[in-house]
Design a protein with these regions (language model features):
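Outer-membrane beta-barrel "beta-signal"
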Residues: 557-570
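Sec-dependent N-terminal signal peptides
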Residues: 5-15
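Extracellular/periplasmic loop regions
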Residues: 357, 392-394, 402-482, 486-493, ...
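Signature for the C-terminal beta-barrel architecture of outer-membrane proteins
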Residues: 125-135, 245-246, 250-255, 277-439, ...
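N-terminal periplasmic/intermembrane-space "pro-region" immediately following the signal or transit peptide
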Residues: 19-185, 190-202, 425
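Outer-membrane beta-barrel translocator domains and adjoining extracellular loop/strand segments
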Residues: 156-163, 219-225, 269-276, 315-327, ...
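Transmembrane beta-barrel strands of outer-membrane/channel proteins
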Residues: 144-154, 207-215, 257-263, 308-314, ...
């Protein structure tokens, strides 16, 4: 029973270990929420009606809209289709550095007065300059994707200098780092082919898919192990149908169905984003390059500003921590053009062997979990100073036993868009319930597959490795500043508390607390988006153990980490 308890415990702990910036192998922006999409036209015809028709045709071709999750492959396809128009001389895309509400996309189109009659088709076998695109015509797009990244990560006094009591019973541990300074190297490389083709032009129906293979490695003494590891495996492997058009009333509609291996993200990752695990035999623990869920089925329909979707998937967990979890869900969102989004979701877990352990010795299973979720996002006006606001709440129950867990957050701040460097400052309060042993109801929040990056739900570069969005109350003050183009600084100050003193289901060393104060952390992230191909990242954090930790673990020391990675992709 104890062994099963520890595996269930560390499944919860380990599933959330992530880094401070999404490192999805497809794109550094992959999965980011799209805040704004704008178009800039050069050399529009003087005839107003002709100019309007051309601009509308181009804008309707790029079918990534505000409040959607960014897909680099679909974006590349839409850009290639715009470039096929005979009246287009050149088209480029620029993606802003991420902010609190996601990314902004700017598409610049240069038109030609004389329509070019020459073929716009690309074929790498005839023209090597087409690379990485393999083949492109007015109906099809086939491209090669590649990414590679290496990281140096270091800690001073990891696990607050006390790895033995904090990691006792962890099945992944083999001589971990701890007291003193340690560093290690890890990396990954991914290669894949992705394509899409319009198979029924009359109804604008496209068949699309992709497959990729990834290798990863770790070398040195890291968070859990000093074993050098090298691993290779399939990452993406999916196929789908996508299409759309315009109703008789003039409303745009689109639909999408997909099956296979691919990452799934719900909203900004409050519930679901880390749909695969890294580390252990897969290596690359902190780079966190694997995201693809297994057996993902996703279907969505969007008309005008209303979107309805359904999904089913199995998270790609580590074999030693596999909980055999299956998640089904529906999601409904209603948004304005680009300012406001209202959403609601329902999740159901029909299958899982993950256990919940109670203070009285009872054991329950995640199987039967139901999650009800609502959210509201508000963006400031495009290009202007303004308020941003985000809030989300969720309630968990279980059809097999008495459960009632609750989580919510509220984030508000001000973005100074019209000021040099476009700084912003915001405050976020987040609460994830813990279990009250004096009631008959189980109340500890199940963190599911949250995470993402340091501006999403990785709450603290170091503290997140101790406490993973369950029985946790956090305060975050965050400032973002862009001192020069393509360079971004993210500064965070954190305070962490445990709402309940009973912490069974969290870190084993902190199962019973005598204080609510978990600690504090200050961190700084430097991001340099040199180009669409090159990205540089540095993160440092200093974490102070609070009385809830120091009273359970003797002789703790403050925890410092410093890491940097470079990434190349196309």
């Amino acid at each position: 029973m104890m062994n099963k308890y520890l595996i269930s415990l560390f499944l919860t702990v380990f599933s959330g270990v992530s880094f401070a910036q999404s490192n999805n192998p497809l794109s550094i922006y992959e999965g980011e929420r799209v805040e704004f999409v704008t178009f800039d036209f050069a050399s529009l015809p003087k005839d107003t009606l002709v100019a309007l028709n051309i601009s509308q045709k181009i804008e309707n071709t790029y079918k990534i809209y505000p409040n959607m999750s960014y897909s680099s492959f679909m974006s590349d396809y839409y850009i290639s289709q715009i470039g096929m128009y005979p009246f287009v001389e050149k088209v480029t895309i620029d993606i802003s550095e991420p902010n609190e509400n996601g990314i902004s996309i700017k598409i610049t189109v240069t038109l030609t007065e004389n329509e070019l009659a020459m073929s716009r088709n690309e074929n790498i076998f005839k023209n090597r300059k087409a690379f990485p695109n393999i083949y492109t015509d007015s109906r099809s797009f086939l491209t090669f994707k590649f990414s590679s990244s290496e990281m140096i990560y270091s800690n001073n006094n990891a696990w607050f200098g006390q790895p033995k009591p904090i990691l006792t019973g962890n099945p992944l541990v083999h001589n971990p780092e701890g007291d003193g300074y340690y560093g290690w190297l890890e990396g990954f490389a991914m290669a894949g082919i992705y394509g899409i083709s319009k198979i029924i032009p009359r109804y604008n129906i496209h068949l699309y898919g992709g497959a990729s293979y990834m290798v990863s490695f770790s070398c040195g003494r890291e968070m859990f192990s000093d074993k050098s590891r090298f691993y290779g495996g399939l990452e993406d492997a999916f196929i789908g149908l996508i299409g759309g058009g315009r109703t008789l009333r003039g409303d745009n509609y689109s639909y999408n169905m997909l099956y296979g291996r691919k990452q799934f993200i719900l909203a900004d990752g409050f519930l679901l984003i880390n749909t695969s695990m890294n580390g252990d035999n897969r290596a690359a623990l902190q780079l966190n390059p694997r995201w693809a869920a297994k057996d993902l089925f996703q279907a969505s329909f969007k008309i005008d500003r209303l979107s309805i979707g359904a999904f089913h998937f199995k998270p790609n967990e580590l074999p030693i921590l596999n909980s055999n979890t299956t998640i089904n869900g529906i999601n409904v969102e209603l948004g304005s053009k680009d300012r406001v989004l209202i959403g609601a979701s329902f999740l159901h877990v029909p299958r899982s062997t993950l256990r919940y352990f109670l203070a009285n010795g009872d054991v329950f299973f995640r199987r039967g979990l139901q999650v009800y979720n609502i959210r509201l996002f508000i963006n400031p006006p495009q290009g202007k100073d303004g308020l941003f606001f985000k809030t989300e709440g969720a309630y968990q129950r279980n059809s097999n036993f008495n459960m009632g867990a609750f989580a919510f957050y509220g984030e508000a701040g001000w973005r100074f868009t019209e000021t040099k460097g476009a700084p912003s400052i915001g405050y976020r309060f987040a609460y994830f319930s813990g279990d009250n042993p004096s009631t008959s109801r189980y109340e500890r929040w199940d963190a599911l597959y949250t995470g993402g990056n340091g501006e999403q739900w990785v709450q603290g570069s170091n503290m997140y490795k101790m406490v993973q969005n369950s029985n946790e109350l956090s305060h975050r003050l965050q400032a973002i500043y862009n001192p020069m183009p393509k360079l971004q600084l993210v500064m965070q100050l954190w305070l962490f508390y445990a709402p309940r003193l009973l912490n069974l289901g969290g870190n084993a060393a902190l199962s019973n607390l005598s204080s609510h104060y978990l600690g504090s952390e200050v961190n700084l992230t430097v991001k340099y988006f040199k180009s669409r191909n090159w990205y540089f990242h540095l993160n440092t954090a200093y974490t102070f153990a609070g009385s809830a930790i120091t009273e359970n673990v003797e002789k703790t020391k403050n925890w410092f980490c410093l890491s940097t990675f470079v990434r190349y992709s196309f």
